[in-house]
């Protein structure tokens, strides 16, 4: 087992990474609170109820999918907590993927003006990305995560064993976020991904531990430098400007988050290449790596149809589009001076972009 620590001005918390560690750490943390509640999906509870060791009274189920990140679910969960006696010394445990983590964190941040919570991510995507950093959020029709807070957990417990029951498509979706870290700041991680594709797809425990740890070190570094996303933290959104637009256009049903981010990273890198921001070799290596992990890189939507979503992206300001574009493998920059028409023109120039 390994331990990392997130060190912020007003909050410090551990990240535990190991195999079959869930039961031990869950018991240790549950003893710290007056009441403990687990927010999860029913199928996850059925798979791990022996590890969770909690009665049905302590479980609050959430439907699967991005549609659960809604005001409707926030109100329902908050009422469930109130009816079951949750007080200010209670804690809620997010046991699931990014949807569960984002939703649970948001509820924790506003219920009784803030109660404690623990992240227990069960998907690769949540383990390497969304479970740390304190971002919580829900979706509205106009875009993803437009309503949210910054609210950090007491701890993050990453049990690699939970990836054994993760469907292949969900697992691959998480790999996109690992590739992102390689692209934005860790060239050696990107090289490792290129050389160990088969072992990663086969869920080799030692290989998984390595890429999870390396990803978290990247995320931890950025969050500690820029907790509230005023500057540096924006680079974590590489691929997400286009990716979130693609997710929203598809009604949060057609694509998993990582699938949309994979297309988004490819579009951003293609754009960078077309405007002379990066060499073709950067685009080619990213393309080859994404394809080797089984991602479909075809954007099914017209670029013009995505622009409305892109202009509502959280990084945008004054109607201007901000994009994270790669200079080379392991280095990206925030680009603010691109015109909408130039983005559309550049992306439409390539075969397979839009219809």
From Swiss-Prot:
Enzyme type, top EC level: lyase
Compartment(s): Cytoplasm
Domain of life assignment: Bacteria
Annotated EC: 4.2.3.4
Tagged with keyword Nucleotide-binding: yes
UniProt keyword annotations, A-Z: Amino-acid biosynthesis, Aromatic amino acid biosynthesis, Cobalt, Cytoplasm, Lyase, Metal-binding, NAD, Nucleotide-binding, Zinc
Chief subcellular location: cytoplasm
Gene Ontology molecular function, alphabetical: 3-dehydroquinate synthase activity; metal ion binding; nucleotide binding
Catalysis: reaction(s): 7-phospho-2-dehydro-3-deoxy-D-arabino-heptonate = 3-dehydroquinate + phosphate
Keyword Amino-acid biosynthesis attributed: yes
Cofactor(s) needed: Co(2+); Zn(2+); NAD(+)
Biological process, per Gene Ontology: amino acid biosynthetic process; aromatic amino acid family biosynthetic process; chorismate biosynthetic process
One Pfam family of this chain: DHQ_synthase
Pathway(s) per entry: Metabolic intermediate biosynthesis; chorismate biosynthesis; chorismate from D-erythrose 4-phosphate and phosphoenolpyruvate: step 2/7
GO cellular component: cytoplasm
Entry's cofactor comment: Binds 1 divalent metal cation per subunit. Can use either Co(2+) or Zn(2+).
Family annotation (InterPro entries): Dehydroquinate_synthase, DHQ_synth_AroB, DHQ_synth_fam, DHQS/DOIS_N, DHQS_C
CDD domains for this protein: DHQS
Residues that hold NAD(+) according to the record: 98-102, 122-123, 135, 144, 162-165
Function recorded in the entry: Catalyzes the conversion of 3-deoxy-D-arabino-heptulosonate 7-phosphate (DAHP) to dehydroquinate (DHQ).
Name the UniProt record assigns to this protein: 3-dehydroquinate synthase
Organism: Dictyoglomus thermophilum (strain ATCC 35947 / DSM 3960 / H-6-12)
Gene: aroB
